[in-house]
Amino acid sequence: MDITSESLFEIGVEVAQNTSISMHEFSKAEQASIFTHSLNDIKPSDKAMLSRTADSLYWLARYMERADFLARALEASRRLATLPKAYGDAETEWRSILLSAGAAEAFSASGRVLDEKNVIEFLTFATDNPGSIRSCIELARLNARAVRTALTREMWDTINSGYLEMKNLEKRMTDNSTDDLTHFLEFIKQMSLAYDGGAYRTMLRNDAYWFTRIGSFIERADNTARLLDVKYHVLLPEKEIVGGSLDYFQWNAILRAVSAQTS
């Protein structure tokens, strides 16, 4: 904790307010001694968090939330893409998930052809996409390593073991195309749930906890807003009447994407 003249003055005022003796009755040396004892009484949990620690916790939570959203959105898009052509265009579905993920421009710049295989690869394991699931988990682990003392053992174990398992699944999918995609997406969702559960069940309700919550909620709001925007401006063809069969299937998929579908 950095001690400045302003902080010393504030502590002195607080001490004066909590005592029946006026501070003016003490000499400067005695006042300084009172300030020192007051500072020593401050608990470690009351000290200000370093900005870099707060930043790492915030982005750790955002990356974990983003990976979970991408896994659920990919799962929903795969369902929509399997609908009969009479219900819509599969290419539109894959373009919509790129827009929902905020990755449409990066995908176009990569020179990839817009199809199912390329979109899935770009959003899962592409190293040239900083917003892919692989990149999100790697960056989440990097931030977690920087603030391990602010995390509980359960949270770190979830992130670290999840990262190692993701690397194994990546090798398996590279050898076997996208046959294991369903298993991989389910694994990412379970990893995210374990992380959230660890944060909720094991973290002290201090600054570290609230910075992780802020990161998660901001990322969730951002993803949900983009998803709704895409639903209204991209997915539904003009000829389709709102409330029709395609509209129903799309809303059902969106509920799955945001974990809001009831059983």
Q: Can you annotate each of these PLM segments?
A:
Residues 1-263:
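Alpha-helical transmembrane segments and their helix-helix packing motifs
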